[in-house]
Amino acid sequence: MQVADISLQGDAKKGANLFKTRCAQCHTLKAGEGNKIGPELHGLFGRKTGSVAGYSYTDANKQKGIEWKDDTLFEYLENPKKYIPGTKMAFGGLKKPKDRNDLITFLEEETK
């Protein structure tokens, strides 16, 4: 298991670009924007897997039971299907730790 090195602050600007090119087609960021193909990400940090109202999760997501934080997102974003076998998340993951830190830094600000 890799753990996020939170002492290495990511670049939110680079994270914004990653979100736009890799995530925005399926996810929204702000309260009230609603679910798309994937659940809205508003309030992501501190939320349990499989808990966004109105989104149809797989049993695997509902039963994972972890809380989204820097370290859990860091591991998940490397390979979502490995972290939650049975997820319907189609995204293949971000292999570079720097990219994951950049995206997490962006998400920490934009999903509040």
Curated annotation (Swiss-Prot):
SUPFAM superfamilies: Cytochrome c (SSF46626). The modification N6,N6,N6-trimethyllysine is found at residues 81, 95. Heme c binds at residues 23, 26-27, 89. Binds 1 heme c group covalently per subunit. Gene3D superfamilies: Cytochrome c-like domain. It is found in: Mitochondrion intermembrane space. This is Cytochrome c. It comes from Arabidopsis thaliana (Mouse-ear cress). The lineage of its organism: Eukaryota, Viridiplantae, Streptophyta, Embryophyta, Tracheophyta. The gene is CC-1.
